[in-house]
């Protein structure tokens, strides 16, 4: 298989814009941009590229088609693509493409205008044997680290990332809202936030768990639930997290 030098990009969301711009800066030629609104993704240069809305109109002579759409749309888009080019998608949880191709999953939240995006970011690679050499070279153009994972390893890593990043960020968002409602300055909690992140980086989160849940301090738990009466949608989260902490540590202690 030839090196990936000319591509078509499907999608115009954050992944399309950030990864597309990164590859364009590395000299990759974009022959077509395809999305429902038939617009040029922000941050990319058109040059001589076609701008289309129908995936079936993508030129069949490109080296690869980059499918950077939502997970729910990937399989439907792939059904409409020309059969010849290599197909690459960026989902952490979907299967590898059936036809020759693979997955390049960025192990990082993709955010526009983030300085960290310009310094490269870790990427997980899973692909067919025939595409391995070309996709490895292509990924290394923008990756700070490249990790080869099987399909099930990548899907498990994506699940872990949701807990480590998405859910953690949501918990911080809840904490920040509670502080705002009580007129508490968020900088009070910056030291403990940094401590938690350091423990996570060290891989010692479980061993260093603290708080009323692990102590089974029911009076503190009840007091917290009482404070959540004004935001009842947070109560199931608090209760589920409390039970999860207790269950995880009880399972470890059971001989």
Where are these regions (language model features)?
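Short amphipathic alpha-helix with an adjacent loop that forms part of the alpha/beta core around
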Residues: 55-61, 79
């Amino acid at each position: 298989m030839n090196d990936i030098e000319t591509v078509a990009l499907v999608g115009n969301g954050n992944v399309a814009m950030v990864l597309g711009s990164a590859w364009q800066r590395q000299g990759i030629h974009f022959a077509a941009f395809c999305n429902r609104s038939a617009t040029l993704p922000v941050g990319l240069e058109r040059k001589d590229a076609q701008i289309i809305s129908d995936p079936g109109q993508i030129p069949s002579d490109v080296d690869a088609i980059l499918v950077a759409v939502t997970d729910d749309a990937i399989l439907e888009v792939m059904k409409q693509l020309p059969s010849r080019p290599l197909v690459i998608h960026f989902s952490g949880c979907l299967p590898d493409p059936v036809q020759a191709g693979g997955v390049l999953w960025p192990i990082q939240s993709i955010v526009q205008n983030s300085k960290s995006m310009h310094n490269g970011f870790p990427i997980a690679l899973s692909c067919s044997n025939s595409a391995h050499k070309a996709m490895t070279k292509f990924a290394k153009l923008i990756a700070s680290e490249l990790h080869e994972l099987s399909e099930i390893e990548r899907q498990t890593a994506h699940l872990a990332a949701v807990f480590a990043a998405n859910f953690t960020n949501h918990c911080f968002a809840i904490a920040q809202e509670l502080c705002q409602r009580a007129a508490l300055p968020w900088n009070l909690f910056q030291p403990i936030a940094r401590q938690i992140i350091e423990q996570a980086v060290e891989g010692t989160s479980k061993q260093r768990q603290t708080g009323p849940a692990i102590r089974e301090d029911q009076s503190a738990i009840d007091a917290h639930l009482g404070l959540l009466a004004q935001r009842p949608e947070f109560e199931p989260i608090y209760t589920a997290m409390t039970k999860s902490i207790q269950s995880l540590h009880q399972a470890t202690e059971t001989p």
